[in-house]
């Protein structure tokens, strides 16, 4: 035998010998677990009650076999601001147990990099090129017939969900796991045929440093949550992956396929969806092999329960249109069923200390995009916020017949919300352009569409739509329509072309959420195909609501100070439509066009439309919009004991008394912040370099200057509002000039306009440009003749310019005073 073979074969022989010897030296699994209760399922497990341990026997046929590992929070923190909600899902990880001597390693596979090839060597080359992750190593306690027994307990008691990191990120303090206060939660450790579920009570110990933990935890230095761990059998073969198309409206999985021809993209995308097949593929209408069934959390009370069931059930219409019979159902969760059991798609009712977002998450097979379990989390306080909106609009306590109308408006929103979040768990992304097509999708964020009847009374019967929209039907067709064998791609393209022929708009989050985004149709919480027309209509409704605002908006027996809580969303009723209109300025129409599909390529919005938008926004900076309702002082007293001004109120400089100027300033900053968004202005400046049919940035800013500084107030309040707008306009411009977020030429234009356009009235009445004003030298200037209040105002403006010239960094921080949280209406963004 050669020297090389001797040195190679002997270590291999020794390794195998010691492995066998190691197993022989271990007690048998039966011996080690004597007296323990065996739970049989996908993974069997023993619960050692005396030691508080979970022991997992891993059979030989389970070694090197992939399965899905998911962690979640069945019992959460209860703070919307921090997150960590009840039912929150963690990531989806494909893992397997790998034998390593006398240890088992739980190894996460890397499906982000693959070789979709029949050649094993090609697949192996990619697998070896990129790292895996060993999540845990387990010492073997016992063994027999090639299987091993491991103690899963330390793995289950770790911070799998990243709780400590989330608390630190939220500024709530440094926390660590307290081992002596953590234990297995045996009541929720169960084994099922396709999945095995484990749960643990985990306590975090630390020093709280934020303001949110103390509001939801009895002893803030000790946070006790429950963490759930699911070992899930991966679906069998047969799921037909559907290629993702940016026009389809779906979420997707993505991976790099190194077996792709070099003439094709390296990265592949496939949609996320449930498996759905007809029992009889040849029949025009057929029952499914397995329907998609969602189950309601038994903790949802009436009448919310019925509303959720009705709204979620709307989706069956879309599947019926594809030839399925009862393919989608909503049922009550069976008694005794575990909500975290992967066999149940769940609609869960989540309580928090403050209102917050609802969301639809899913357990997804990362290999294929198949949804294994849909999990909807609905915030229970949403409906209270919707009812509060109705109280502000309808003043139902002066006419109790309107009280039922207010309740129905809140329930109508809940139906729509249930459909929206279930839509996410079917694989659908947001469509924030659907409002341009007459409320064409439940995947949009709807603002209540309130009308005035012939008598001038508010009507809310059409506040929220009922049923799916046209876009929803088309989107479900792409993800779930049966596809003819061998012609799958051809049929999918036909579906897309049919959708395009309807003229429906589709723009998702990245084109709608940023305040500086540009699409004239893609907005959150808006209505109408013409944003400007809708803003004007909404302001009429708002004025009507403010004119009659008073004690009839407040329930009997409530402190009058709580009326301000109802007033806030009425006064700021137009905030989201303002954002929609602002996107017309520097706006660009575009689609998710694919070569050859004939869709609109990017084009700037016509200049006339941009000016129409600017005029509409400038009107919101006038007294007609910012003025206070008559008798406001009597309506908003300071809060009594046990009540307080919280973040749902406007900020105040005047202590506990309502501060009208602070409320006005917040709305002024909201509008100006959108009109002067750095992305918006940079886009305008750049487009004007290459096109003559757009609004030049200097002309735009001059237009704003002229409108804002040429107002002629005719009352004390009007004058105060005008001066406040001018102050905030200058401060916002100085912030932009000092910002690193705008291109240099835009900063130069802003700086030049400020220095040349802000005037100072001298004794002779002549207006001097700032660079000629003596005040620039020593801030003494010529004595001012006129209103001392206005003199102080102009002096303040000049002072800001001096501060900027001395130290631009002083203005780099965003100067905006935020409005009280708006989203979510009824779902954290607080614009």
For each predicted feature, which ranges?
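Extended catalytic-interface subdomain
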Residues: 370-374, 378, 418, 422-426, ...
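Sec-exported extracytoplasmic/periplasmic mature domains
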Residues: 313-324, 423-424, 428, 448, ...
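Conserved catalytic/binding loops enriched for acidic/polar residues
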Residues: 437-831
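Zn2+-dependent metallopeptidase catalytic core
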Residues: 63-64, 301-327
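Bacterial Sec-dependent N-terminal signal peptides
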Residues: 1-23
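Soluble non-cytosolic domains of exported or imported proteins
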Residues: 88, 298, 302-310, 408-413, ...
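Auxiliary tRNA-acceptor-end handling modules of aminoacyl-tRNA synthetases
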Residues: 23-300, 318, 332-385, 390-406, ...
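The catalytic-center signature of Zn2+-dependent metalloproteases
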Residues: 332-351, 412-468
């Amino acid at each position: 035998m050669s020297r090389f073979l001797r040195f190679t074969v002997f270590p291999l022989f020794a390794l195998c010998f010691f492995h066998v010897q190691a197993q022989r030296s271990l007690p048998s699994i039966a011996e080690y677990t004597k007296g323990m209760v065996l739970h049989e399922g996908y993974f069997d497990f023993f619960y050692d009650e005396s030691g508080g341990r979970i022991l997992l026997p891993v059979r030989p046929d389970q070694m090197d076999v992939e399965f899905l590992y998911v962690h979640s929070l069945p019992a959460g923190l209860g703070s919307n601001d921090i997150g960590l909600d009840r039912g929150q899902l963690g990531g989806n990880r494909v893992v397997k147990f790998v034998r390593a001597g006398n240890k088992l390693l739980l190894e996460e596979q890397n499906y982000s990099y693959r070789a979709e090839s029949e050649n094993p060597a090609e697949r192996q080359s990619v697998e070896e090129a990129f790292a895996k992750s060993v999540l845990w190593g387990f010492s073997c306690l016992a063994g027999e017939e090639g299987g091993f027994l491991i103690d899963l307990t330390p793995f289950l008691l770790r911070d799998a969900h990243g709780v400590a990191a989330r608390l630190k990120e939220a500024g709530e303090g440094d926390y660590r796991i307290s081992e002596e206060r953590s234990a297995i939660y045996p009541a929720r450790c169960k084994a099922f045929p396709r999945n095995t579920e484990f749960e643990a009570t985990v306590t975090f110990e630390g020093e709280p440093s934020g303001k949110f933990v103390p509001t939801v935890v009895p002893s803030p230095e000790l946070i006790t949550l429950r963490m759930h761990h699911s070992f899930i059998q991966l679906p069998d073969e047969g799921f037909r992956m559907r290629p993702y198309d940016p026009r389809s409206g779906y979420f997707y999985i993505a991976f790099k396929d190194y077996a792709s021809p070099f003439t094709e993209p390296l990265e592949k995308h496939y949609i996320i969806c449930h498996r759905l097949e007809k029992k009889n593929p040849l029949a025009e209408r057929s029952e499914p092999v397995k329907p998609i069934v969602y189950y309601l959390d038994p903790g949802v009370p009436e009448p919310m329960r019925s509303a959720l069931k009705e709204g979620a059930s709307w989706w069956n219409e879309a599947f019926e249109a594809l030839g399925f019979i009862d393919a989608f159902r909503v049922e009550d969760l069976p008694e005794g069923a575990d909500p975290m059991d992967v066999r149940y798609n769940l609609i869960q009712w989540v309580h928090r200390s403050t209102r917050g977002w609802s969301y639809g998450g899913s357990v997804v097979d990362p290999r294929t995009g198949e949804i294994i379990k849909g999990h909807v989390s609905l915030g229970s306080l949403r409906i209270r916020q919707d009812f509060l909106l109705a109280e502000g609009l309808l003043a139902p306590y002066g006419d109790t017949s309107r009280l039922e109308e207010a309740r129905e408006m809140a329930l109508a929103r809940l139906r729509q919300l249930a459909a929206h979040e279930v839509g996410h768990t079917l694989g659908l992304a947001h469509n924030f352009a659907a409002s341009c097509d007459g409320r064409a999708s439940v995947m949009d964020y709807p603002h209540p569409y309130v009308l005035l009847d012939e008598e001038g009374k508010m009507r809310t019967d059409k506040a929220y739509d009922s049923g799916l929209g046209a876009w929803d039907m088309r989107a479900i067709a792409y993800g779930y329509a049966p596809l003819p064998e061998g012609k799958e791609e051809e049929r999918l393209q036909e579906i897309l072309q049919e959708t395009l022929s309807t003229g429906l708009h589709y723009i998702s989050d990245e084109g709608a959420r940023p305040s500086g985004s540009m699409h004239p149709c893609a907005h959150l919480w808006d209505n109408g195909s013409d944003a400007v027309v809708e803003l004007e209509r909404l302001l009429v409704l708002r004025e009507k609501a403010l004119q009659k605002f008073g004690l009839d908006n407040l329930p009997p027996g409530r402190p009058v100070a709580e009326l301000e809580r109802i007033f806030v969303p009425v006064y700021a009723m137009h905030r989201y439509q303002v954002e929609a209109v602002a996107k017309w300025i520097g706006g660009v129409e575009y689609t998710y066009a694919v070569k050859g599909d004939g869709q609109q390529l990017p084009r700037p919005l016509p200049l006339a439309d941009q000016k129409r938008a600017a005029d509409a926004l400038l009107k919101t900076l006038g007294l007609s919009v910012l003025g206070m309702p008559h008798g406001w002082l009597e309506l908003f007293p300071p809060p009594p004991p046990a009540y307080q001004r919280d973040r749902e109120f406007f900020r105040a400089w005047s202590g506990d008394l309502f501060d009208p100027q602070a409320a006005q300033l917040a709305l002024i900053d909201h509008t100006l912040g959108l009109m002067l968004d750095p992305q918006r202005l940079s886009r305008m400046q750049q487009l004007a370099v290459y096109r003559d049919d757009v609004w030049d940035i200097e002309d735009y800013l001059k237009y704003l200057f002229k409108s804002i500084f040429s107002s002629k107030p005719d009352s004390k309040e009007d004058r105060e509002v005008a001066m406040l707008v001018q102050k905030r306009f200058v401060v916002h411009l100085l912030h932009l000039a000092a910002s690193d977020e705008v291109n240099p030429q835009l900063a130069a234009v802003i700086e030049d306009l400020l220095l040349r356009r802000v005037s100072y009235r001298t004794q002779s009445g002549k207006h001097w440009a700032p660079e000629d004003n003596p005040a620039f030298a020593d801030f003494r200037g010529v004595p001012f003749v006129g209103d001392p209040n206005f003199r102080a105002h102009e002096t303040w403006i000049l002072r800001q310019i001096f501060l900027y010239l001395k130290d631009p960094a002083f203005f780099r921080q965003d100067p905006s005073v935020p409005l009280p949280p708006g989203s979510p209406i009824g779902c954290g963004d607080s614009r």
